[in-house]
Amino acid sequence: MNIKNLRRLYNIIHTFLRYGIDEVIPDIPLTRGIRCGRKSLFWVKNQYPNEPFGVRLRLALQELGPVWIKLGQMLSTRRDLFEPELADQLALLQDSVEAFDGKLARRLIEEALGDKLEKWFDDFDETALASASIAQVHIAKFNQNQPLAGKEVVLKVLRPEIERVIKDDLALMYRLASWIPRLNKEGRRLRPVEVVREYEKTLLDELDLRKEMVNAIRLRNNFENSEMLYVPEMYQEFCHKNVIVMERIYGIPVANIDELKANGTDMKLLAERGVQVFFTQVFRDSFFHADMHPGNIFVNPNHPENPQYIGIDCGIVGTLNQNDKRYLAESFVAFFNRDYRRVALMHVESGWTPADTDIDAFEEAFREVCEPIFAKPLSEISFGHVLLNLFTVARKFNMEVQPQLVLLQKTLLYIEGLGRQVYPQLDLWQTAKPFLQDWLNEQVGFKAMWRDLKQRAPQFREHFAEFPEAMFQALQQQKQINFRLNEINQSLKAQRNNTGFSRLMILGIAIAGTFWKFEMLPLWVSVPLLVIEFRILIWCMSFSNNSYS
């Protein structure tokens, strides 16, 4: 660690101490040396003793800067780890920082594009339209030399030196995270190193704007010609690692309820479409925008009777596999049916909790946490909080962290919050139920079986030519096993007093042959032979019994 990093580490610790964050260090013999060092090296007291811990932590992170602000924002979504009061305070962190110089932004963009801006654009505004911790945006329009002459665009450019700043602070975060489990028993449950690793992946992805471009193009294609969602066009020839250029959009911020109502927006349909957009992304596309906070969502002011969302900033996305979607759909349906045993089994069958989990205890834990939720009408139940409760219980039974589901739960809370802000009477269950039922109907039952058979047909056809040889090998092996069984039976006639041992020997040889075939032969060969073996086994046991009678 160099002098610069040491100075930064000192500043971080000093800031945490000024806000009294060290109160989480327990007063036990193990931490005595740390507490003595704290008093010797840092002559600073908690300057906000009357503020709750959550408020002090939020203020400390805000003061430490962009990287720590975004960490706090991410932690605010991990309500399976933190108390609601603390998570609520972290959610108040604002990723809004002063813009860097517009002339520097121009120079960075020109370096990325390889020429002066005037070659492609007119009216570049050096005053940033918006500025955040990672990047800021400027507006311009295509000049007369371009096919889209006069089209307004937004140019997004990374902050200078941001990658170095982030990597330096991440290294310090890892160091601090490694200390937490040693200082506090509760810290081990939080798995701080794992949390920082998850945060690092998300943050480093945001440092390559080309990934945002790819995500936006994919989302735009998924909702092409959709009345529900519009995603601005990306101009790929102008997109680079630190600069992207996209279509400029005009819309009403989704949080501006008064303006939406003044525009005559159908608020009920708007709220329902928010839920529909989310579940369409999850169950149809397996790909969802995972940063759908109010600052990234607008409403098209045209056709307010048929409202359309506009989504921007696709830097953070989530993807789901079939196992994830099955877990979600079946867990939600089982929850609303109050089938907590099925919920418990889903976690084990998914491989997310250990196979030796006590299902009875797991079921009862879900019942204790989830049953009180039904004190509310179904229409008022939050899917996001249902998932949160499931995760909270599952973590106590050693569920592995599933980052894609954490992202999904965070996004679901955003969508639900916005939906009920737009239309307080929104019935989430009735809006989401068709998506869950349609997906489950598509995935289980005869249709799903027939689809799987059709998909596997080329594989069956490819291996069909191998059938005669495989069958010949299997029969040869079966002859050897039968011969050995006959030898054993002859030998057992001389051991009539050891009936238990003899039967076990017969059973063992048969089972060994069975396992060999399942491991070495195609399924369509080994299954018929398994039937033959069981008949031989029954015959052997019968023969053995007759010998002893």
UniProtKB/Swiss-Prot annotation:
Cell compartment(s), UniProt: Cell inner membrane
Name any one Pfam family assigned in the record: ABC1
Q: Which EC numbers does the record give?
A: 2.7.-.-
Stated membrane topology is: Single-pass membrane protein
Residues annotated as catalytic: D291 (proton acceptor)
Pathway in which this enzyme or protein is active: Cofactor biosynthesis; ubiquinone biosynthesis [regulation]
GO MF annotation list: ATP binding; protein kinase activity
- Name the residues that span the membrane: 505-525
Query: SUPFAM superfamilies annotated for this entry?
Result: Protein kinase-like (PK-like) (SSF56112)
Protein's UniProt keywords contain Repressor: no
Q: Which residues bind ATP?
A: L129, A130, S131, A132, S133, I134, A135, Q136, V137, K156
Alphabetical GO CC annotations of the entry are: plasma membrane
Q: Which GO terms describe its biological process?
A: regulation of ubiquinone biosynthetic process; ubiquinone biosynthetic process
Q: What is its main location?
A: membrane
Q: Where is the Protein kinase domain?
A: 123-504
Does the UniProt entry include the keyword Repressor? Answer: no
UniProtKB keywords: ATP-binding, Cell inner membrane, Cell membrane, Kinase, Membrane, Nucleotide-binding, Transferase, Transmembrane, Transmembrane helix, Ubiquinone biosynthesis
What InterPro entries does its record include? ABC1_dom, Kinase-like_dom_sf, UbiB, UbiB_bact, UbiB_kinase
Provide the function of this protein: Is probably a protein kinase regulator of UbiI activity which is involved in aerobic coenzyme Q (ubiquinone) biosynthesis.
User: Which family does the record assign?
Assistant: Belongs to the ABC1 family. UbiB subfamily.
Instruction: Please state what the protein is called.
Output: Probable protein kinase UbiB
Q: What is the lineage of its organism?
A: Bacteria, Pseudomonadati, Pseudomonadota, Gammaproteobacteria, Pasteurellales
Q: Which gene encodes it?
A: ubiB
